Structures are given as structure tokens and as C-alpha cells.
Amino acid sequence: MDLNADFTKRVVVHAGDVPWIASPMPGVDRRMLDRIGDEVARATSIVRYAPGSAFSAHTHTGGEEFLVLEGVFQDEHGDYPAGTYVRNPPTTSHTPGAAEGCTIFVKLWQFDLEDRTQFRLDVEAQLGPVQDGIARAELHRDAREVVSYVVLEPGAALTELAPGGIEVLVLEGTLREGADDLVRWSWLRLPEGTPLQATAGSAGARLWMKTGHLPFAQAPLV
């Protein structure tokens, strides 16, 4: 299955308007944003766990990163409340679930296969000082990509010139980019060479952002 798999094109998905699609596990549904592959896939999705649902134990052959959007995500290693960013590199494993239900933004098979750095962060706790109406937290950096949490005050202008492409998920508030008004859970992907030039709405905006990574996009090596 290929979905938004041409990484040379600009893509906007208003995920709040996308229907949920049932996963193979009962009680776990997905909104797919981009995908190369079937059940083993390089994938970007929003995933919803119903209360009491769980996924079977599995190993992250290609790595997994996620941000908890709502509720509390759980596995045998602990609880991950909303606002937690997690990187589970290749070879890690767990049995995920959510006793009270949760929603996460998750990316699969998008790691350097030699990466072994595993961590979790409270994104709010990482924020730096406000400059020109914008506060930033760098969540992860390596030779392939930079992952950030960005908070914009009302009307703040955000410009990113990062090579290698840009990807943004709006977590709260609104963001104007080109002719599009991005709202909560709107997802934007800009191809390599296209700058991000956006302005926060009247309530400001909170964003998850990744830059530099699109040249490495490929189907899982299985």
C-alpha cells in the first residue's frame, strides 16, 4: 500500500476529518498519513487505543517513535502521559496498550537501522525561552534528522529553511501555511527544498516538527 508516498510533493492532511481504520488488533484504530508497505510499512499515522485495548508483543525491527496526544499510553516499561515523546530504536520491543484509552502520533521504520538510542521526554519540560514569539525544544538530533517541539504565540511568524524536507503536526491552535489553515491534528509535509513559511492564528499554535529526513524515505528492508 502506498499513501502520500511521493516525497517530492507537498502534502496536507487534516487528520481530524480522516476516518478511523481498524487495525488487526481489536480496539486499535488508525488514521494513516503516509505509508509505504502493508502491515510491515514505513508509516506515519495517528493511532487510537480504546480503553482496555492492547497490541500484541512486538519488536521494532525498523524503529518506532511516537508522541502521546491524548490519554496515557502504557507498556511494560511504564506509563506515558500526553506530551511524552518516545524513541524506541531498532531491536527494542514492548507490549503496548492503554487501560483508559489514548491517542498517539507514531512513525515506524524511519530510523537509521544502526541507531540504538532509546529515550522518553516530556516535551514541555524541554522548552527554551521565547524569542520573537516562538519557544522551541529540540527533542532529537542525528545525522539524518532533527525533531522539535515548537510553541508559537498568537500571530508569530515561523520560517524554516531546513534542507531535506519538513514535516509538521499541529498539536493545538491554528497555523496558516500557504493557502491552508492548519488546525489541531493537521499534518503538513514539505518536500526537500521547500521552505516553511507559516503564521500562528489568534490562539497561537503548538507543533511537532521534523526536518531533514525525507531523502532517507524508503520501504522497509524486510
Where are these regions (language model features)?
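A short, N-terminal "cap"/entry segment at the start of jelly-roll beta-barrel domains
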Residues: 1-39, 99-144, 148, 222
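Ligand-binding loop in jelly-roll beta-barrel domains
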Residues: 28, 79, 90-114, 181, ...
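Glycine- and acidic-residue-biased ligand/ion/polar-headgroup-sensing regions
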Residues: 51, 60-75, 163-178, 184
